[in-house]
């Protein structure tokens, strides 16, 4: 609260995480004096837009996996769980570590459940993506920074939100 007038929340987080993180930020801002209502809130939102829901999830699953590899677990997953990310389950972490140990990043990607991808990204059909981005807005995000999972999705994502 005493350093800036806004925040950019990181990628691969759910709207529920966003609510929790913004509560922590608001409490801190109120302690240190700035008016939280004047804060700008941006968030990087991983998106995958396809006509087929499963295809969309598979296209962005790698991004979720990068946050759950053995090196990143303590730096990324741990803090997210402490803030209240409901889609990362402590009991799954040994399974992810084992999948990575046995199959590298490809093994880990295959081990990431759909629930993780659906929970921490805005992915699916165009209607699903639009609805999910609205959930981030409802959680307090004023500036959604949409990041497509694949280059071929960029124009479609731009067109979807240009309407």
Q: Where are the model-predicted features located?
A:
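An alpha-helical appendage that flanks or caps ligand/catalytic pockets
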Residues: 18, 23-135
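C-terminal helical cap(s) of enzyme catalytic domains, especially alpha/beta-barrels
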Residues: 18-28, 151-163
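Ligand/cofactor pocket segment of small-molecule handling proteins
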Residues: 3-18
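Structural motif
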Residues: 2-3, 139-140
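Structural preference for beta-strand elements that scaffold enzyme active sites
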Residues: 6-8, 38-44, 142-145
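Bilobed periplasmic-binding protein-like "clamshell/Venus-flytrap" ligand-binding domains
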Residues: 70, 119, 142-148
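Active-site beta-loop-alpha junctions enriched in small/polar residues
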Residues: 12, 44-48, 149
